[in-house]
């Protein structure tokens, strides 16, 4: 079991290793995403947050997942193209993963172990659940799919000013 956020590693959309130790000192928002979901328009607000704060040490990592209503059926290339064409996404989109179950990615196993959801439920309930990590690698908040990215603005500002 991973003991530190910075020990985590995943694959980027090209299948290359992405080590979380490069995120030290940054505020990070991690979101499981999907292209064919009612919450898909959240990409727009996520991109706005990223553009607003990326120069101040803020990063968003999007993790495509097809576990909820099969709403992310595309290949990694198709997902990237969709995000760029429809929402102008410039924040990193990682390789498609599972977030729940026996094949769940280690990133999500770690996040869920650090911050349970509503009523202590650890599993991810739907697309566009969000985890906010401070600049010391502590998972400080978990937000449901219903939480609009724009509503996280003050929280992100506060973490960036610490």
From Swiss-Prot:
It is found in: Cytoplasm; Nucleus; Mitochondrion outer membrane; Mitochondrion inner membrane. The active site is at 37 (cysteine sulfenic acid (-soh) intermediate). GO terms for molecular function: glutathione peroxidase activity; phospholipid-hydroperoxide glutathione peroxidase activity; thioredoxin-dependent peroxiredoxin activity. InterPro entries: Glutathione_peroxidase, GPX_AS, GPX_CS, Thioredoxin-like_sf. Disulfide bonds join 37-83. Present with 2010 molecules/cell in log phase SD medium. The active site is a conserved redox-active cysteine residue, the peroxidatic cysteine (C(P)), which makes the nucleophilic attack on the peroxide substrate. The peroxide oxidizes the C(P)-SH to cysteine sulfenic acid (C(P)-SOH), which then reacts with another cysteine residue, the resolving cysteine (C(R)), to form a disulfide bridge. The disulfide is subsequently reduced by an appropriate electron donor to complete the catalytic cycle. In this atypical 2-Cys peroxiredoxin, C(R) is present in the same subunit to form an intramolecular disulfide. This is Glutathione peroxidase-like peroxiredoxin 2. It comes from Saccharomyces cerevisiae (strain ATCC 204508 / S288c).
């Amino acid at each position: 079991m991973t003991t530190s956020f910075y020990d985590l590693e995943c694959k980027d959309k090209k299948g290359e290793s992405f080590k979380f130790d490069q995120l030290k000192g940054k505020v990070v928002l991690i979101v499981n995403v999907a292209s064919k979901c009612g919450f898909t328009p959240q990409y727009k607000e996520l991109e706005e947050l990223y553009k607003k704060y990326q120069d101040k040490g803020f990063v968003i990592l999007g993790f495509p997942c097809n576990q909820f209503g099969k709403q992310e059926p595309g290949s990694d290339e198709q997902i990237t193209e969709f995000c760029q064409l429809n929402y102008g996404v410039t924040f990193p989109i990682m390789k498609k993963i599972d977030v729940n179950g026996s094949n769940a990615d280690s990133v999500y196993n770690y996040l869920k172990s650090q911050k349970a959801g509503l009523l202590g439920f650890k599993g991810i309930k739907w697309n566009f659940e969000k985890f906010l990590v401070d600049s010391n690698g502590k998972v400080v908040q978990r937000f449901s799919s219903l939480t609009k990215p724009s509503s996280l603005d003050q929280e992100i500002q506060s973490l960036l000013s610490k």
